[in-house]
Amino acid sequence: MNHFPKLLSSQIGFDVAQTMLEYFDRHYRIFREAAVDAKTLFERGDWHGLQRLARERITSYDERVKECVEVLEDEYDAENIDDEVWQQIKLHYIGLLTSHRQPECAETFFNSVCCKILHRSYFSNDFIFVRPAISTEYLENDEPAAKPTYRAYYPGTDGLAVTLERIVTNFQLDPPFEDLTRDIGCVMQAIDDEFGHFDEAPNFQIHVLSSLFFRNKSAYIVGRIINADRVLPFAVPIRHVRPGVLALDTVLLRRDLLQIIFSFSHSYFLVDMGVPSAYVDFLCTIMPGKPKAEIYTSVGLQKQGKNLFYRDLLHHLSHSSDRFIIAPGIKGLVMLVFTLPSFPYVFKIIKDHFPPPKETTRAQIMEKYQLVKRHDRLGRMADTLEYSSVALPLARLDHALVRELEKEVPSLLEYEDDKLVIKHLYIERRMTPLNLYLQNGSDADVEHGVKEYGNAVKELMKANIFPGDMLYKNFGVTRHGRVVFYDYDEIEYLTDCNVRRVPPPRNEEDELSGEPWYTVGPHDIFPETYGPFLLGDPRVRSVFMKHHADFFDPALWQASKDKLMQGELPDFYPYDAALRFSVRYPARFGATGENDGAGDAQRAA
């Protein structure tokens, strides 16, 4: 520190620090209670309750921050506390965290509160946690009644089948399994199919995280197999095959499959973690290369993920020299998008003004982004990180980008010494725009992209999402080849839309008209009219009609809306339906097995 306090003499400093930690502890207690409730809701098959719980948990953090800020302002006149006391507040807070089990998350909470009270000129390590102060290495909950982060199992003692069954039954799920012996046999067959015969080394063991990961209609067992110097990841989704009866749906044994279920395009898991850093460290061992920021976000600690991401950005800026540039591709009417080529993300800013035909406001667009944050993204909508007062070094901004910023978003800019402060922006994973992917791709790429696009829109439809603007430029292709939607300014709930057929033309003049001859309400959608915008390229048209000819039939859209209006929640799988045991090993299921994965079995990733 520049002016390190020699004595922690301020009682107010201690009281403020203690109050802030009390509100963080309240937040984390609610966070853990949500994961415990998720287990109960999963056991009951209360899918609507699980959706509601996930939505409520997302807003809980900001509610606790708001409550804490109000208390500090009312009881301690926080805005007028002097600099030396603020430094003491941070030091007292560090002292209170020395034996805390979520210190990194508590530091982030401290930052969130301070950023509501202090001017951004105080956003330095003197006053907030620009860098972490408390180490999380080897952190564990050592209370006698506490669950360990993970449990170790040794198949060499009792055999693999017995060990796998013990792993499943140790989670003590209330509903019975349809046939756990059958399912364990499927797991062993899948392991054999993937790895073949292998010799068991003396250290052969299985590590399993002690809490289940809940999302959608699944509960995931997550762990790793260790044999000699190999570390093999796995995840086993548990699902209801019918009300009150469970089954192991598959086992995912490849790192890329785990990276997909933990990806930025899926909703956050509900998982009970006494020591979140220990869970994240474990997940890093089975998904090396995946940023910790993304892992924290995927397990529901999105504010911690956001904090780590910003630290990653600052670190990258200090170790790179390229410039931020306008993102390649077709410019949007609503958002200004730029990127740093050496950093795999895009930065999106809502423009000050929108040209016709756009009729919207900044507040409406921000609400659309919140809608996506709260909604089940199913692996088909990109998550966004929302930031305020982001300071970027002017020397790293391309001149063309600066001119574009000054033209399109002058109200959001503030020059501060050698930095440009952007008052509000969103950050997303960078993807290849689907229109460029189709334009530049091989025939095989076009087939893959078009098939994925149709699947993505149909899955969003079943999840009650109408994308609005469905042009290819509003979708991206991830590094795993998945098509993901990322332009949200026209997004609507499908249940709020009026699906219509185009009325027949009344005469030849109507037929030749370039304008609709029928009235169009603000929520009317006409699937029959999408063809001219999507099928202009002959290669695309051929593949589209091969895989998704029903896309332009209003009956498809209306059927999804009707099911949603009846309260039906379709099944979605963040892995190929062909991996499901009932599909992969049908002989093991016989007449009692599930169907072949058609119908509601949708691939959501």
Curated annotation (Swiss-Prot):
Catalyses: L-seryl-[isocitrate dehydrogenase] + ATP = O-phospho-L-seryl-[isocitrate dehydrogenase] + ADP + H(+)
- A biological process from GO: glucose metabolic process
Which residues does the entry assign to the active site, renumbered to this chain? D383
Write the record's keywords in alphabetical order, separated by commas: ATP-binding, Cytoplasm, Glyoxylate bypass, Hydrolase, Kinase, Nucleotide-binding, Protein phosphatase, Serine/threonine-protein kinase, Transferase, Tricarboxylic acid cycle
Q: Protein biosynthesis among the record's keywords?
A: no
Write out the residues that bind ATP.
Answer: A327, P328, G329, I330, K331, G332, L333, K348
Q: Where are the transmembrane segments?
A: none
Instruction: Identify the main location.
Output: cytoplasm
**Per UniProt, what is one GO molecular function of this protein?**
phosphoprotein phosphatase activity
One GO CC term of this entry? Answer: cytoplasm
Q: What is its EC number?
A: 2.7.11.5, 3.1.3.-
Q: Which InterPro entries match?
A: AceK_kinase (IPR046855), AceK_regulatory (IPR046854), Isocitrate_DH_AceK (IPR010452)
Q: Where in the cell is it found?
A: Cytoplasm
> What function does the entry list?
Bifunctional enzyme which can phosphorylate or dephosphorylate isocitrate dehydrogenase (IDH) on a specific serine residue. This is a regulatory mechanism which enables bacteria to bypass the Krebs cycle via the glyoxylate shunt in response to the source of carbon. When bacteria are grown on glucose, IDH is fully active and unphosphorylated, but when grown on acetate or ethanol, the activity of IDH declines drastically concomitant with its phosphorylation.
In terms of PANTHER family, this protein maps to:
ISOCITRATE DEHYDROGENASE KINASE_PHOSPHATASE, PTHR39559
Similarity field: Belongs to the AceK family.
Q: What's this protein's name?
A: Isocitrate dehydrogenase kinase/phosphatase
Q: What organism is the protein native to?
A: Burkholderia orbicola (strain MC0-3)
Q: Which gene encodes it?
A: aceK
